[in-house]
Amino acid sequence: MKATEIVKDIMEKQGVGQTALGKRIGVKNDAIYQRLRQDNISVERLMQMLAAMDYKLVIVPASKPVRENEYEVEV
């Protein structure tokens, strides 16, 4: 999945809308909308949005399998 698709999936699972996510990270709804439309998003912005939903970015060896409830970002 693309990074923005992962964020959208987590938002859906948690019932968090764009406005609520924006409030959590201190940006306007339009900024969240624009970020989620991008194919590429900076690691900093990705981490910021994930942290607001109690997720974190972890780097592991590529040979390690993705477990249930984990995501793998495609480039």
For the regions a language model picked out, list residue spans one by one.
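A short, Lys/Arg-rich alpha-helix, primarily the initiator
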Residues: 1-14
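Short alpha-helical "recognition helix" segments of helix-turn-helix
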Residues: 20-22
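Short, charged recognition helix plus adjacent turn
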Residues: 34, 58-75
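Short, basic-rich loop-to-helix N-cap that marks the start of a DNA-contacting helix
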Residues: 38-51
